[in-house]
Amino acid sequence: MYQSMNLSFSSNFTNLSFLKPRLYSGISARAPKSLHFKFNPSCVSSGPKSDDSPLSEKLISLLKAVPNWSDGIKERRMQQKRSLYTHENWVRHRSSLRHLRHVSSSPSSRVILSLIPPVFFFTTVAILIAGYNSAVDLDWLPDFFPVLRASPLPYQLTAPALALLLVFRTEASYSRFEQGRKAWVKIISGTNDLARLVISSVHGSGDELIIRDALLRYIVAFPVALKCHVIYGSDIASDLKNVIEVDDLSLILQSKHRPRCVIQFISQSLQLLNLDSTKIDMLETKMMQLQEGIGVCEQLMGIPIPLSYTRLTSRFLVLWHLTLPVILWDDCHWNVVPATFISAASLFCIEEVGVLIEEPFSMLALDELCAMVLSNSDEAVESKEVIRNRIIAKKRILEIKHSSNGWHKS
């Protein structure tokens, strides 16, 4: 009644005759059939993972709470509008009370707030190491637990290297800030010169005046478009809605590169003016200055200080302060806690300033500079005819005084 069957498994076991007595009579003899077993990894240890995963996520989110809070404040401060200094600002800047004012404003400083996560971490490490060493010294731990101490000689040898690393890092960041500032000085001066040349070159009426007014609006819109291009979170539609017309603004908003789109508006408008080649060449030279400004700004935005240099500085600082309590234990004991706090606050503050000024455009008063360009252009247009008529009137008065019936008075 029983027929021999070969059960073929994916593990290549065959001719398992010891399974024959377990076969039921209702099973008919059929060709051997391979049995394939599928492994589902999600079914293995799913119970503990479902319990541990939310706990680990909560722990990670708790550890990230303070850094995220300080980073949020720092980024909001980065987007605040800067203002140009006036005479009153410089008097306050030179005041002998500036030190008291700077110290009293420390709780609201974004640099100080950004130091909370690293300084708190390394101070906590110093407390743990000091507590451990004290427990070993008081024989609260078994004898095989060593006291964490080391010679300060390696620190004395590497301290100048760390100092130079921080100095060069900050100097490199400041040089980038200077490049950004000089680039915007050229952009603003080039925009003002271009607007002045257009105002002084166009004397016609009708269509030429319409083209001139539109061209001046495009020129004024360029620094605004570039400012929105290099500063994160800028609203170009809001900034340009009162500068250029709606249809032109919609075309600029659709462009992938908005500053170059404004340059195209300026270039096409210049071609429609009836100007001689000399004036056209002068205007084109000023436009080249604006295009160079775009290139400098994009290089500063897209190419940071070499990341290997930034990472080296960060790693050096972290390793330095992780081992600082061990180095200072023999000389300071529990004073390693305030010593680590002061060292971390000082050195990480220098490094943080270098990181902040590495991206220079949020540090510049670009909104006020753009508003100044607009006001200068409007004032130049309004005063052009007044000044021109006044000079013509003076010329006529001089001609009347120096001539009588076509002859010069003796």
Swiss-Prot record:
**Which regions of this chain are Stromal-facing, per the record's topological domains?**
132-147
The residue range of the signal peptide is none
Q: Name one GO biological process term.
A: regulation of photosynthesis, light reaction
Annotated Gene Ontology MF terms? voltage-gated chloride channel activity
Give the catalysed reaction(s), semicolon-separated: chloride(in) = chloride(out)
Where in or outside the cell it occurs: the entry states:
Plastid, Chloroplast thylakoid membrane
Residues in compartment: Lumenal, thylakoid: 1-110, 169-315, 358-410
Q: Which residues cross the membrane?
A: 111-131, 148-168, 316-336, 337-357
Indicate the segments annotated as coiled coil, or none if absent.
none
Against PANTHER family, the record matches this protein to: UPF0187 PROTEIN YNEE, VOLTAGE-DEPENDENT CHLORIDE CHANNEL 2, CHLOROPLASTIC
Q: What does this protein do?
A: Voltage-dependent chloride (Cl) channel probably contributing to proton motive force (PMF) partitioning across the thylakoid membrane by anion influx into the lumen. Influences thylakoid ultrastructure, including lumen size and organization.
Q: What is this protein called?
A: Voltage-dependent chloride channel 2, chloroplastic
Query: Which species is the source of this protein?
Result: Arabidopsis thaliana (Mouse-ear cress)
GN (gene name)? VCCN2
